[in-house]
């Protein structure tokens, strides 16, 4: 297997956000879970996956926390400069991947999703790579969904059967995602995740159902839930 085969994947982790909703003294990716930071859990899960050759982490310039982590000195972990928005950070990571010809496929994963399971990544790769475009892990919406007015009143009920929660990882060819993000940023388009950039180019990325416990830590109460899931995952691997 060579570095440029589809069986070699580079993970990109945008980790330049501040996580203001957590109301913590540091960005949420550096909060502790079971003795390690959220970011350490996330990166370790990615590095342990056999097909991931490198993890490219986009960090804010001057970030005082990342250099203190043990994994910051791991040769498989590459730091690049993060940007103001998520798309800028991912594009920075993609530039490194292309410049060094690391892989034809990239897998973008949220820094604040430490509970990703290898079984979900296996499923994503198996269903997406034959399509030659890309796709994302996602979870079908379970709750009844309401469309609100500006006054925060219910305007109508939305058919949830066609709605999915977008998760990560999101897996695309390096060249296509680079082109999509670069074009979207140049045109000042709204890019909320990698798949939205691909959609703006006229493609339809595949939805691959993943586990709902692959949560993104956003609110303070999410930390306890993530800690529970991580402990459960640890017991299952024993």
Curated annotation (Swiss-Prot):
The biological pathway it contributes to is: Isoprenoid biosynthesis; isopentenyl diphosphate biosynthesis via DXP pathway; isopentenyl diphosphate from 1-deoxy-D-xylulose 5-phosphate: step 2/6
Give the catalytic activity: 2-C-methyl-D-erythritol 4-phosphate + CTP + H(+) = 4-CDP-2-C-methyl-D-erythritol + diphosphate
Q: Which UniProt keywords apply?
A: Isoprene biosynthesis, Nucleotidyltransferase, Transferase
User: What's its EC?
Assistant: 2.7.7.60
Which one of the record's GO molecular function terms can you name?
2-C-methyl-D-erythritol 4-phosphate cytidylyltransferase activity
Q: Name one GO biological process term.
A: isopentenyl diphosphate biosynthetic process, methylerythritol 4-phosphate pathway
Q: Where is this site: Transition state stabilizer?
A: 21, 28
Establish whether keyword Cytoplasm is in the entry: no
Entry's SUPFAM superfamilies?
A: Nucleotide-diphospho-sugar transferases
Please report which protein family the annotation says this sequence is part of. Belongs to the IspD/TarI cytidylyltransferase family. IspD subfamily.
Q: What does this protein do?
A: Catalyzes the formation of 4-diphosphocytidyl-2-C-methyl-D-erythritol from CTP and 2-C-methyl-D-erythritol 4-phosphate (MEP).
- Indicate what this protein is called per its UniProt record: 2-C-methyl-D-erythritol 4-phosphate cytidylyltransferase
Lineage per the UniProt record: Bacteria, Pseudomonadati, Pseudomonadota, Gammaproteobacteria, Vibrionales
């Amino acid at each position: 297997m060579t570095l440029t085969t589809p069986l070699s994947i580079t993970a990109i982790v945008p980790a330049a956000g501040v996580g203001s909703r957590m109301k913590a003294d540091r960005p949420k990716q550096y909060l502790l879970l079971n003795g390690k930071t959220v970011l350490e859990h996330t990166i370790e899960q990615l590095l342990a996956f056999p097909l991931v050759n490198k993890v490219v982490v986009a960090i804010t310039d001057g970030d005082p926390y990342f250099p203190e982590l043990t994994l910051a000195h791991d040769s498989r972990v590459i730091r690049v400069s993060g940007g103001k928005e998520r798309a800028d950070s991912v594009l920075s990571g993609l530039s490194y991947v292309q410049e060094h010809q690391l892989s034809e496929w990239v897998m973008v994963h949220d820094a604040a999703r430490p509970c990703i399971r290898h079984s979900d990544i296996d499923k994503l790769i198996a269903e997406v790579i034959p399509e030659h475009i890309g796709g994302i892990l996602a979870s079908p919406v379970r709750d009844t969904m309401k469309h609100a007015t500006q006054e925060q009143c219910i305007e109508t009920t939305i058919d949830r059967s066609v709605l999915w929660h977008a998760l990560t990882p999101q897996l695309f060819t390096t060249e296509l995602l680079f082109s999509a993000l670069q074009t979207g940023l140049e045109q000042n388009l709204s890019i909320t995740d990698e798949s939205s950039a691909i959609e703006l180019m006229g493609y339809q990325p595949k939805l691959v159902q993943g586990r709902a416990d692959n949560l993104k830590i956003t609110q303070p109460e999410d930390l306890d839930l993530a800690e529970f899931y991580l402990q459960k995952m640890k017991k299952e691997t024993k």
